[in-house]
Amino acid sequence: LVGNIKEDGTYLRKTKNHFQSLNIQEVSGLAETVDVKNKQVKLVGGKSLAYDKLLIATGSQPVRPPIPGIDSPGVHPCWTLEDARAIQKLAKPGARVLQMGAGFIGCIILEALASRGVDLTVVEMGNRMVPRMMTEGAGTLIKEWVQSKGVTVYTDTKVEAITPVQSSGGIVSKIAGIFGGSSTSPLQVKLSNGKTIEVDLVISATGVRPNIAYLKNSGIEI
């Protein structure tokens, strides 16, 4: 998001035969269940893979808070390269951006957004920034420093609803109109502190959950 790294700089494997060179067999597919008794991983489509030892490294996915309007156009997580592309298109200088969440990863995201020259508001439901890692004093210092950089921060605050509205001249709509592109309607974001904010982009940085649904009833202790 800052622009210091091109997309190809995010690739961990630089050659097509990366796995082969390490004597690793690559199989593309979705794991459906794990049969612990017979030591097999069953894939969607019927194929099974036998194992002696099983490493579970299936990653995680962003949490989608149960907020009305969370699936509206213009609301994005910041998790994948595709997410970053979508955010780059909307987070133009002067764009009004609201970020939900001010944890460790959220602070990295907000720093990148601030460097892009957006009008940024951060909403954190905890009583301080980075609530799971910082004491109240340290979290307050971070909040004060972020505010000194021109970012609006609301702690002890939740997003209650997100509502698309008719375009009212947001910077993203203006830019899109000039270049003949399609635009995303502005969004009204209702907060628990009584404020309602109109923005061009909402970023959800409210945590992640592990991709382990396929392990249900497998006998593996999570």
Regions found by a protein language model. Give the residues of each.
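Residue-level detector of alpha-helix initiation sites
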Residues: 60-62, 82, 104, 129, ...
